[in-house]
Amino acid sequence: MERTKIDILISGGGIAGLTAAAAFGTAGFSVICVDPTAPVTERNTDGSDLRSTALLQPARDFLETAGIWAKLNPHASPLQTMRIVDAGGEVAEPRLTRDFDASDISDRPFGWNLPNWLLRREMLARLDELPNGTFRPGVGTKTLLTRRSEALVSLSDDTQVSARLVIGADGRNSPVRRAHGIGARTTRYGQKALAFAVNHPIPHEGVSTEVHRTGGPFTLVPLPDYNGMPSSAVVWMERGARAKELYELPEDAFNDAMSERSCHLYGPLTLATRR
């Protein structure tokens, strides 16, 4: 069996795994990152991750050190204001609103929002620039044997890696965690989240808005304009059964439902991606 000797093996090619790979590679370590599923790096491709990630100031500085931020900056939406809206009651309407402005504590925004599919695309581009960094899509972790000075990892392509450090960045059902016998406890809250992007006629002006009602928050996070209109990423938390009902609605009915749930703060919302 072919064996490769490296400093670090990372199992998982999501945002956490690719960030670690780029950071360690930039620091001079030899790195291999594997993932059984190739990341989807286009917005409208089936399987793309339509969630977004808000990178706060320390994360932005870390990504700059890892050589990634210069690639992300042109696509990032600054988060200047955090707005909390209490819309409880029979009718979805704002009853209490509180704004928190980043200028009260810093000369920079709270953070910057980016779509997850785009984060993966730019992180892969950074990893591709590094002579000591390798990404291997379609390859997963099979077995893990730890010794005093190294870990021997067998991969799904029948190769083996000897690494000084193994990082499990492979999700809640982590093969690395299970291979090493590390247990986990699962707590279920009876909620599910719908994630998608929307267009709206009223600009968000860098405001991230959480609208709170029974069932969970409805959060709009700024994105760059899309198709000439203001755009936001949405995470809509609801009880499981209600989330399923919403997911199965025809698009026009879904647009109406989410516009009402948002209290029409940005005008009528229309889907800009699948949900």
Where are these regions (language model features)?
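Glycine-rich FAD pyrophosphate-binding loop
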Residues: G25-D49
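Short helix-loop capping/hinge motifs at secondary-structure junctions, enriched
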Residues: V91-A92, P201-E205, Y226-G228, R242-K244
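Central beta-strand plus flanking loop segment that forms part of the substrate or channel wall
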Residues: N173-H212, G216-T219, E238-R242, M258-C263
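Conserved FAD/dinucleotide-binding core of flavoprotein oxidoreductases
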Residues: I105, T214-R275
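Conserved Rossmann-like nucleotide-cofactor binding loop
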Residues: A16, P39, N173
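N-terminal FAD cofactor-binding segment of flavoenzymes
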Residues: G47-G89
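Conserved N-terminal helical subregion
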Residues: E2-T4, H75-A179, T187-K192
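N-terminal Rossmann-like FAD-binding beta1-loop-alpha1 element of flavoenzymes
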Residues: I6-C33
